[in-house]
Amino acid sequence: MHKAGFVNIVGNPNVGKSTLMNALVGERISIATFKAQTTRHRIMGIYNTDDMQIVFSDTPGVLKPQYKLQESMLNFSTSALTDADVLLYVTDVVETPDKHNEFVEKVAHMEIPVLLLINKIDLSNQEKLVELVEAWKALLPNAEIIPISATTKFNVDYVMKRVKELLPDSPPYFDKDQWTDKPARFFVNEIIREKILLYYDKEIPYSVEVVVEQFKEDAKKIHINAVIYVERDSQKGIIIGKQGKALKKVATEARRDLERFFGKTIFLETFVKVDKDWRSSDKELRNFGYQLD
């Protein structure tokens, strides 16, 4: 008998959802940084064996939207509650259980199995952990609570074991050689954006969108032209930096990661353009692939 199903990872920003996703799938599918709101899209990572297929989905952190981009991010998160066979609700030892009560209330009424994962336990102590477990039991009495550390991979194997046990019998949903639902260009976008998140401060990383305008691949190399969009001229200057040094650093670091990701020589050219207030434009958000409905 073959098992298959959709396992969706949800939770607040910066609790370690993307790190967990990568640990479960065994591939670096989602970018992960120390900054909140790193993930903007719903990203599938597909784990295959001969008799099983697990379709994991990493989702943006739950937040109160302040502009249309964040509305789209919240849509990705809430839609993950409607099509899961198993839900992984990720919290951590820092945030309080009463954060985003409305979303937790939706999770509490779900009829599918819910694994509540308390992440980053390597940063806490036993007494604090016991308090959190009791608080979450009161909020989500039907959930199975598992303390984990996605970074050190503590209990990640146990989470995978429980997921496998909870999956329904089903034929596979995707070809067995497929490991994600995203095209190659998407990962180029994400890797470049990850470097911007790491190397720039304040609002700059959140005002950026990356678009691959050219992706030409042959047996040994890939030529990539990527445009970094910002909202204002002042942001363009900051991204480029003095004598272009800041942008060069981003491109150099991104190229190294892309070569590891694709296993080929990468020729990467980056450009910076202004798209005024794109985060609040329905048209531009749709052009960039965001879900608005």
What residue spans do the PLM features occupy?
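Conserved glycine(s) of the Walker
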Residues: 16, 155, 246
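Conserved C-terminal guanine-recognition region of P-loop GTPase G domains, centered on the G4
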Residues: 51, 75-143, 216-218
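Conserved G1/Walker A P-loop phosphate-binding module
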Residues: 1-81
